[in-house]
Amino acid sequence: MDIDRGIRVAVDTGNVILGSKRTIQSLKLGKGKLVVMASNIPEDLKEDIEYYAKLSEIPVYTHEGTSVELGSVCGKPFTVGALLIQDPGDSTILEMVG
């Protein structure tokens, strides 16, 4: 299973938070297992996500694609700058990037 497929399976079968702001809010609470960021996420959001993820000891993966491509991988008709996987469901994404 490749990374894109792992993300899609997690979105379809698990519990995933989409969006930079909601991801940061959950990171502040220490919730989540993996953060996935788009390659073109704004630098200020990237720094915030990396900071709060480090405090919560949650790994961060930077997706090769843009936010448009990450949204498409998630099966959404909008851009996704970042997402937080709380429960991967049937996906093996945590093993792939961890």
UniProtKB/Swiss-Prot annotation:
Per UniProt, which keywords does this protein have?
A: Ribonucleoprotein, Ribosomal protein
Source species, domain of life: Archaea
Q: Name one GO cellular component term.
A: cytosolic large ribosomal subunit
GO MF annotation terms: RNA binding; structural constituent of ribosome
PROSITE patterns recorded: RIBOSOMAL_L30E_1, RIBOSOMAL_L30E_2
| Organism taxonomic ancestry | Archaea, Methanobacteriati, Methanobacteriota, Methanomada group, Methanobacteria
Ribonucleoprotein found in the keyword field: yes
- What is one process in the GO biological process aspect for this record? translation
One Pfam family per UniProt: Ribosomal_L7Ae
Name of protein: Large ribosomal subunit protein eL30
Is the keyword Nucleotide-binding assigned to this protein? no
Among SUPFAM superfamilies, the record links this protein to:
L30e-like
Family, according to the entry, reads as follows:
Belongs to the eukaryotic ribosomal protein eL30 family.
